[in-house]
Amino acid sequence: MRLYEDILIYLYTEYEMNITNKGVQYLAECIAEVYKDRIWSVHMTYLYEAIASRHDTTWKNVERLARQEVKKVSNNKLGEFILRQAIIIKQNKKKERNEK
C-alpha cells in the first residue's frame, strides 16, 4: 500500500506544480482502478474537485474525462505506467536523501 500512497503524494505535487491536468487525471484514475475501495475513491474525489475548481467545472465531469483517458489504454500499459511513475518517485526520494 505504501507505493500507492507515494504515487498519490506525487499526484498532488504534480498538480500543485501545474503539470498537465490530463496526466494527473490519468494517473489518479490508474490508482482508482487498482484500489477500488472507499478510501481511495474519497482521495480521488478530492483530487477531481481540486482540478474542477481550477477549470470552473464539476468534479463529476473531471472524473468522466479521466475515465475516458483510461479506456484508451490496455491493462498492460496501465500497469507499466504506474510502475514507471513509482520508479521515478523512488529515484527522486533517493536523490533527496543523498542531498541531505
Locate each region found by the language model.
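Basic, alpha-helical nucleic-acid-binding regions used in initiation and control of genome expression
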Residues: L3-Y15, I19-Q25, E29-I31, K36-K100
